[in-house]
Amino acid sequence: MHGNEIKWKRRSSRKARDIAARILGYLALGFMLAILVSIFAYIIKGGAAAVSWNILTTYGNTSDGGVLNGIIGTWELVGMGLLFSLIPGVFGAIYLTQSVSRKHVADAMRLFTDVLTSVPSIVIGLFGYLVLVIKFNLGYSLVAGGLALGIMMLPYIMRITEMSFRNIQREQVMNAYALGADNVNVTTRILLPQASAGILSGILLAISIAAGETAQLLYTASFNSAGLPSGLTHSPVGYLTYFVWNGINQPSAYAHNLAFISAMILIISVTVLILISKYEDVVGRLLRRILGPLGVILNRVFVEAPSEKEDKGTSKGEKKWKK
């Protein structure tokens, strides 16, 4: 009887702990949802009340005009940053995944990318100003701002792409090597197509973070209230976060309205990007269809073409270059 009573008390204690943990989980979830809904409601309410077609389709600054230069400039800067970070990020992840014999180099790269992830954006902005704007004489420009954003986007793309590669079943990769496939074939036929959804998630995360940055752009892109940049260098660029940062500090109601509208556009854009990344299986299937033919092209360029030249060379008796 005494033993049954002890078992009953233990079961009751475990049940009480489970209930308490569940309640705490629900409270945490409710708290986060309350904060998220409050932010969305406050921003969208303020932006929707002030938005108009004229504001969305005209250039301006925080005291006059609209936010079209900010909308276009934001995505120009993000696109430029993606241009500078996508290829190094993906190929860096390929190296981290395939570099079995150079583990110390791969570990050093992971350390550097982790450190780069934690660098404050204002430090990247200061570096961009001193090195890109002044030292390399790019001026306040699309290239300088895009490079600053690319530095920030690079570690996110690299590490998430690496994790996507490592989630692929190792047996598939080893079987491909056992059948005689080289690194190019494994990368283009297995890694890239199967990890395409994860790569997309990393890209969208980097884009979402870059679209909301302000500090490094103040140092590298300045602001253009006259319209779009006239060139890649020595021409400032407008962006939405400037409207938010500068407009909310102005005394006029018009500047506050532009700040709310810009914040609303940003939060809606980021939400759409996140939703796309959540439905990565659908987008991933589309990317696999695109990357499949790309793998065939790369295979023909890097693998089949050299082998054909080798066959032709050996048929003529030109074998000395092999030695």
PLM feature spans:
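Transmembrane alpha-helices
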Residues: 183-221
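Interhelical loop and adjacent transmembrane-helix boundary motif
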Residues: 63, 217-268
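Membrane-embedded alpha-helices of multi-pass transport/permease systems
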Residues: 37, 41, 87-94, 126, ...
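C-terminal transmembrane helix and the adjacent membrane-cytosol boundary/short C-terminal tail
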Residues: 100, 163-166, 204, 245-321
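Generic hydrophobic transmembrane alpha-helix motif, especially the helices
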Residues: 114-151
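Glycine/proline-centered hinge or cleavage motifs at structural transition points of membrane proteins
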Residues: 120, 179-180, 193
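Transmembrane-helix boundary motif in ABC transporter permease subunits
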Residues: 81-113, 126, 274-282, 286
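Periplasmic/extracellular loop-to-transmembrane helix junction in inner-membrane transport proteins
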Residues: 4-23, 43-83, 244-256
